[in-house]
């Protein structure tokens, strides 16, 4: 199994290194015979001797073309003859390529920016992560006395925790009496002990959470300051910092450094990406957070170090568990695109598509188009086109809704209509598909480069799904599932890739044609559903819709929806297929991309309405949840309004317990850097004035008090709130917490802010006069 590939230089010559795991043993293979090359298209082939004379300089050494070869290739499907120019060293290419491109005899150069080791994997047909080797995984995490705003790695590392299949341990240099904690004499000894752990356990994969940006750079810096070498690599090398676009990534030679942070950011959508939030989202279990100021306080006073050590151990354990969850998926993506997992796990979906296309282009003898230069990139960024169709929703509370959507709408359109840069407006074809509205033509005489690859991916995914159904082996089933999910990620990224400004196979005409067909098909479905089957379509978003038959029973709605799916699929061309997604008992739509539904099991599904940030008080979150329940579970909007009025009444009468009023906000930088003083900053400044050490990362819980002046002056620390002495600002909580949380829902039913507040009734006019007369 190939883990990684790179090259080293000996006597001025490049040597490819392949890091492998074979029969449980780690090994390195070398290849001294692979030469770097680029392609050049000449105006006149007789000029090749002139081109061969081009030289440049690199580090005082003359760089030249060492060999040439004329080759037949294809460019966007059309035959082309180019020259393959060979060089002595990979670093010669960036030194000389501009001179070659600018030579009067040269039209253009190609494939001059593919890294040497990646070029080797492509040309030799080598696939990383292929095979059944059992890989050893180890996760680690550090706790430090670093505070944002100060010099990076100024404060010491106080704990290093690690976890693998044998469990989790913590190394520290202050006395902590716990069975999983090993105490050493100093920070220097702790780092040395960690190095020994890595040597003894010899993991193939080192898992971190944000290790690229924090743990590894911090460890490297501290080791430097303490004069310690950090040979974490299997070749005895230290971790190597690499620039990847606008981020820094850390490589450990011979081991895969798997930073989960990048993978999780790409894979799941969360309001915040702390380790605690991610763990809860994936495993449904909470994880305690110990803040930077608490860690510093425990270290300084010696009190509460057991809690910090437990937190550190859990960080490593949780990172290991998350690593085991996500690693197999990334391994499948690595196999699919044919590049090392270290790169794949740090790639955007656009880059994953590109690496896959580069490998397939080589296999098909296609010359890869060049990436855009700065000017072309800027031009592409300015281009725009119409996206998917989104219908303004029908407001109100609806019963008996069905959800219908297209299976892989955009990939299906690309394949069905052969949408590809090499088929676009191609002359001399017998048959074309013409995109609606935009009128771009796509040749149907031969399968386009990208549609043919996409079809193979979708066919493979269907085959895997069939195997999964037939398999009785749970492990085989899980591995097949990882593979089909990897294919799904790649397949669903092709449409976006066409419009990705940095793409080699960028094609704005392709992207806008795909969305134009998408709009046509969803509109066709809507028309047929309403006119032929009597449904009312309530909401459409790009590739799916919600609909109902007003007054019909649930069973009839479901039956007719299934009949419609069968009917429409017989009319749709090619791979296009509509699916019945599910039935919902009740639902309402506020605006585009904001709605809530309840299914037959009583599960509430919301989109765009959630209040999940911590700066919402418990009373706001609780009221919103009760409002949703009243509307969706009981079908009673009036009950929801009554709930809000009751809460505003209780707030007005000071009947809400203070713990439900606490608003939490985090201090994100040193206090002196804040220009706008929000309530949490004002509270933090008052704490600091009393001698409390306030550090970035600290979370302030505050309650807003009744009174005059700005809110920042009326906010106090939650723990200091005394109901006997203090009154909270009921108006603030009604206007800024509860009503905004429920208005986004109740506006859909025509309610305004004034309709939702409890009003203290006064007897006025005739009623008051009559009551007086009765007396």
Swiss-Prot record:
In the record, the effect of residue 430 to M is given as: In strain: AL585
**GO MF terms held by the record:** DNA binding; DNA-directed DNA polymerase activity; endonuclease activity; nucleotide binding
Name a single GO biological process. Answer: DNA-templated DNA replication
- In UniProt terms, what is the effect of altering residue 467 to R? In strain: AL585
Keyword terms of this UniProt record: DNA replication, DNA-binding, DNA-directed DNA polymerase, Endonuclease, Hydrolase, Nuclease, Nucleotidyltransferase, Transferase
- What EC number(s) does its UniProt record assign? 2.7.7.7
| One of the Pfam families matching this protein, by short name | DNA_pol_B_exo1
Q: Which family would the database say this protein is a member of?
A: Belongs to the DNA polymerase type-B family.
Q: What is this protein called in UniProt?
A: DNA polymerase
What is the protein's species of origin? Pyrococcus glycovorans
Originating gene? pol
């Amino acid at each position: 199994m190939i883990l990684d590939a790179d090259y080293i230089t000996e006597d001025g010559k490049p040597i490819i290194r392949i890091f492998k795991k074979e029969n449980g043993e780690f090994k390195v293979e070398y290849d001294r015979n692979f030469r770097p090359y680029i392609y050049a298209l000449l105006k006149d082939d007789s000029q090749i001797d002139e081109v061969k004379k081009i030289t440049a300089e690199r580090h005082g050494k003359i760089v030249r073309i060492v060999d040439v070869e004329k080759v037949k290739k294809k460019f966007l499907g059309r035959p082309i003859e180019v020259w393959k120019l060979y060089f002595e060293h990979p670093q010669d290419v960036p030194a000389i390529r501009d001179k070659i491109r600018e030579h009067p005899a040269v039209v253009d150069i190609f494939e001059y920016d593919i890294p040497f080791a990646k070029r080797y994997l492509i040309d030799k047909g080598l696939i990383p992560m292929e095979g059944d080797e059992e890989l050893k995984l180890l996760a680690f995490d550090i706790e430090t006395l670093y505070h944002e705003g100060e010099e990076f790695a100024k404060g010491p590392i106080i704990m290093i925790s690690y976890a693998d299949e044998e469990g989790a341990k913590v190394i520290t240099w202050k006395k902590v009496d716990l069975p999983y904690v090993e105490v050493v004499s100093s920070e220097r000894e702790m780092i040395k002990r960690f190095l020994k752990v890595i040597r003894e356990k010899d993991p193939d994969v080192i898992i971190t959470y944000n290790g690229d940006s924090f743990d590894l750079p911090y460890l490297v810096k501290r080791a430097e300051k303490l004069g310690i070498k950090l040979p974490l690599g299997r070749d005895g090398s230290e971790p190597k910092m690499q620039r990847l676009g606008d981020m820094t990534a850390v490589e450990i030679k011979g081991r895969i450094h798997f930073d989960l942070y990048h993978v999780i950011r790409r894979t799941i959508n969360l309001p915040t990406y702390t380790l605690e939030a991610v763990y809860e989202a994936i495993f449904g279990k909470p994880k305690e957070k110990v803040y930077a100021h608490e860690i510093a306080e425990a270290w300084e006073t010696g009190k509460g170090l057991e809690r910090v050590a437990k937190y550190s151990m859990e960080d490593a354990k949780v990172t290991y568990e998350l690593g085991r969850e996500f690693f197999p998926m990334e391994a499948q993506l690595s196999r699919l695109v044919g590049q090392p997992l270290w790169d794949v796990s740090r790639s955007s979906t656009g880059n994953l598509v590109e690496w896959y296309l580069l490998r397939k282009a080589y296999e098909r003898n296609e010359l890869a188009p060049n990436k855009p230069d700065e000017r072309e990139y800027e031009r592409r960024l300015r281009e725009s086109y119409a996206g998917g169709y989104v219908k303004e929703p029908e407001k109100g509370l609806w019963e008996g809704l069905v959800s219908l959507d297209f299976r892989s709408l955009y990939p299906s359109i690309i394949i069905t209509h052969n949408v590809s840069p090499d088929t676009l407006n191609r002359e001399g074809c017998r048959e074309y598909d013409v995109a609606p509205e935009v009128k771009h033509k796509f040749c149907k005489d031969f399968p386009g480069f990208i549609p043919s690859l996409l079809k193979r991916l979708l066919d493979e995914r269907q085959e895997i799904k069939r195997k999964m159904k037939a398999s009785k082996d749970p492990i085989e089933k899980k591995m097949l599932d990882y593979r089909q999910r990897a294919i799904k990620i790649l397949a669903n990224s092709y449409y976006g890739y066409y419009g990705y400004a940095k793409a080699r196979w960028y094609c704005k005409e392709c992207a806008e044609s795909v969305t134009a067909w998408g709009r046509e098909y969803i509109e066709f479905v809507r028309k047929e559903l309403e006119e032929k089957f009597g449904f009312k379509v309530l909401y459409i978003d790009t590739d799916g819709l919600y609909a109902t038959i007003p007054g019909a029973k649930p069973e009839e709605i479901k039956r007719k929806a299934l009949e419609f799916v069968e009917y429409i699929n017989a009319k749709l061309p090619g791979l296009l297929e509509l699916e019945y997604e599910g039935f919902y008992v009740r639902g309402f739509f506020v605006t585009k991309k904001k709605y809530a539904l309840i299914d037959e099991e009583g599960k509430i599904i919301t989109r765009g309405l959630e209040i999940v940030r911590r700066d919402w008080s418990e009373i706001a979150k609780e009221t919103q949840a009760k409002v949703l329940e009243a509307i969706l579970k009981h079908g009673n909007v009036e009950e929801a309004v009554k709930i809000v009025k009751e809460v505003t009444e209780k707030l007005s009468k000071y009947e809400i317990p203070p713990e439900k009023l606490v608003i939490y906000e985090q201090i994100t930088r040193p206090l002196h850097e804040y220009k706008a003083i929000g309530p949490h900053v004002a509270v933090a400044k008052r704490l600091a004035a009393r001698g409390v050490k306030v550090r970035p990362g600290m979370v302030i819980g505050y309650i807003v008090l009744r009174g005059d002046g700005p809110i920042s002056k009326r906010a106090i620390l939650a723990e200091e709130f005394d109901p006997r002495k203090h009154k909270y600002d009921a108006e603030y909580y009604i206007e800024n917490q509860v009503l905004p949380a429920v208005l986004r829902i109740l506006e859909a039913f025509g309610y305004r802010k004034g309709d939702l507040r409890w009003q203290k009734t006064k007897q006025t006019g005739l009623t008051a006069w009559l009551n007086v007369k009765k007396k």
